[in-house]
């Protein structure tokens, strides 16, 4: 973890968190993918993992400074602030764009995810049968998740708690969208409505589930990255590649739902061949790919500095 950051650095961290939050609002795009793109993924996992019995004991015994430093709190607070700002400010905008300009939005994210798959794969030091197999397995798992059918589920607070715990684990996995997991659990639009209408009980229970889920799962992921780095990165890159099925821009609606305002919106969709806005879509794909390329080069330059 970097020892010293200035105010400008923390401002950039907030912006990176906003990128993660914007991605997490979209079913099919992972905040974990954005964390990988902007170069904060492993620090994020390690920082979350550091929230444990030892650091919590420091907090409750008044050793605030030790607790703050131990969990890399300045970093975490910046990221969480960015995610929160993005979710509450962009939720309405992104859901509007997905309804009225879906091809253009998905095209941009398709370029982002495709480029991310390539650049994350470059982090694998040695390709062999183990990493290739891990890459394929990750891709198959992600593809299967994208074609699964959404379930009919209850809306009680216990289930909302479980949804928070499960979705947050997906959110920190590149290529596995926490929002799409909520779609499969039948609760994406329910949670989005809770955010837009500021339904405090539902949001608090969901956040509590997310807090438990992320602190538990981050330990597993941190261990895997430390002990089996190449295999873990291969699985994560496979997740990204497999998720491209979900972010393919051209779709036809198979099943719809009616939201709380009486508007009919798509729930289950199938991919089709490009049939409209082709050049605009290609342009946005190139833009998405180019942004990742630029961020990768920027990251390499700052690492060498």
Identify the residue ranges that each predicted region occupies.
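Multi-pass membrane proteins that catalyze or facilitate reactions on polyprenyl-/lipid-phosphate substrates
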Residues: 2-24, 30-305
């Amino acid at each position: 973890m970097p020892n010293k950051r200035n105010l400008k650095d923390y401002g950039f961290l907030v912006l990176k968190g906003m990128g993660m939050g914007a991605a997490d609002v979209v079913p099919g795009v992972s905040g974990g993918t954005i964390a990988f793109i902007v170069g904060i993924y492993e620090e994020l996992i390690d920082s979350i993992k550091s929230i444990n019995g030892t650091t919590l004991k420091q907090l409750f015994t008044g050793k605030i400074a030790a607790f703050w430093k131990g969990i890399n709190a300045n970093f975490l607070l910046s990221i969480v602030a960015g995610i929160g700002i993005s979710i509450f400010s962009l939720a309405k905008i992104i859901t509007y764009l997905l309804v009225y300009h879906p091809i253009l939005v998905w095209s941009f994210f398709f370029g982002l995810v495709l480029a991310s798959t390539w650049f994350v794969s470059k982090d694998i030091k040695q390709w062999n049968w183990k990493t290739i197999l891990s890459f394929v397995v990750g891709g198959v798992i992600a593809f299967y998740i994208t074609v699964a059918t959404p379930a009919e589920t209850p809306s009680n607070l216990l289930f909302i708690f479980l949804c928070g715990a499960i979705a947050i684990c997906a959110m920190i996995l590149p290529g596995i969208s926490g929002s799409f997991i909520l779609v499969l659990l039948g609760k994406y639009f329910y949670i989005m409505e809770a955010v837009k209408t500021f339904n405090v009980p539902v949001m608090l229970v969901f956040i509590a589930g997310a807090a438990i889920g992320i602190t538990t799962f981050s330990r597993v992921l941190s261990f895997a990255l430390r002990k089996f780095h190449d295999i873990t990165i291969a699985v994560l890159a496979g997740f990204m590649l497999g998720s491209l099925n979900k972010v393919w821009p051209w779709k036809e609606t198979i099943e719809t739902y009616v939201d709380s305002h009486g508007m009919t919106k798509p729930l289950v969709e199938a991919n089709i061949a490009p049939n409209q806005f082709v050049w605009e879509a290609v342009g946005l794909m190139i833009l998405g790919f180019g942004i990742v390329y630029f961020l990768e080069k920027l990251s390499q330059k700052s690492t060498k500095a």
